[in-house]
Amino acid sequence: MRVDLQPAYILHARPYRDTSLLLDLLTPVYGRITAVARGVRQSKGHKRQLLNPFHRLLVNWQGKSELKLITGVETDHHYLQLQGNALYSGFYLNELLVRLLPEQDVITGLFERYEWTLDALHRGEPLEPLLREFEFMLLQGLGYALDFLHDCHSQQPIQSGYFYLCDIHQGFYSVPADSDPRFWIAGAHLLAIAAGDYSAADTRRVAKQLARLLFKPLLGKRPLKSRELFTPGSPH
């Protein structure tokens, strides 16, 4: 199979054999693919300079197996120079996708959300809402999203003035009388997250805790390396 001029972002690059690179690419049509860029490690030319993260490429490849061979790379001149926590956030998104997105598994709208998030990071928009929205979309695409609007036991709407507990496999349910208040989640925060409203610091804190809780069984015991780049109290 031959594919021409497919938009792509490099999520990860690692040495392959003596002179090549093994690339994880995110594409809108084929999802995440793994491809070999032959000979680029010994090249100092234009092609090698293109193979950097946060640079939207137009890629040609061929191959019937899961491992593709890159036959051409062009730029569409959309390159984002991220810095500081915005750069680390970009690395965090890339690592999440490499770790969790199965090869050639297409999640509708994920490429566009990824690109939009990078653009927003470049513009200097607040990090936490951007990361949480991306995380929750990825969880939904992977089949692990929770319903923030309904009690998973009673199916009644979440109430702003009530408190809930989280079951990562089922959702949120009203707190039993004998439950530990340390784990209570205000319904107001759940409704705010569902609406994409992260204006309150407590909502941002709860959203971050929930995202970590939901990703934990998917990521396993191996920690995300990109988290080591952030300072304590950062939005990752």
Curated annotation (Swiss-Prot):
One of its GO terms (cellular component) is bacterial nucleoid. GO terms for biological process: DNA recombination; double-strand break repair. Gene3D superfamilies: Nucleic acid-binding proteins (2.40.50.140), Recombination protein O, C-terminal domain (1.20.1440.120). InterPro entries: ARFGAP/RecO (IPR037278), DNA_rep/recomb_RecO_N (IPR022572), NA-bd_OB-fold (IPR012340), RecO (IPR003717), RecO_C (IPR042242). SUPFAM superfamilies: ArfGap/RecO-like zinc finger, Nucleic acid-binding proteins. Disulfide bonds: none annotated. The keyword Glycoprotein does not apply. Keywords: DNA damage, DNA recombination, DNA repair. It holds the Pfam family RecO_N. Involved in DNA repair and RecF pathway recombination. Belongs to the RecO family. HAMAP family: RecO. This is DNA repair protein RecO. It comes from Cellvibrio japonicus (strain Ueda107) (Pseudomonas fluorescens subsp. cellulosa). The gene is recO.
